[in-house]
């Protein structure tokens, strides 16, 4: 599962 910090990395 992708972690919250990974979502921020996409942006």
Swiss-Prot record:
A GO term from the CC aspect: synapse
Subcellular location: Secreted
Keyword ATP-binding: no
Pfam family membership, one: Tachykinin
Source organism, top-level taxon: Eukaryota
Keywords: Amidation, Neuropeptide, Neurotransmitter, Secreted
GO BP, sorted A to Z: chemical synaptic transmission; neuropeptide signaling pathway; tachykinin receptor signaling pathway
Modified positions (Methionine amide) in chain numbering: 11
tRNA-binding listed as a keyword: no
Function as written in the Swiss-Prot or TrEMBL entry: Tachykinins are active peptides which excite neurons, evoke behavioral responses, are potent vasodilators and secretagogues, and contract (directly or indirectly) many smooth muscles.
Family statement drawn from the similarity comment of this UniProt entry: Belongs to the tachykinin family.
Protein name: Substance P
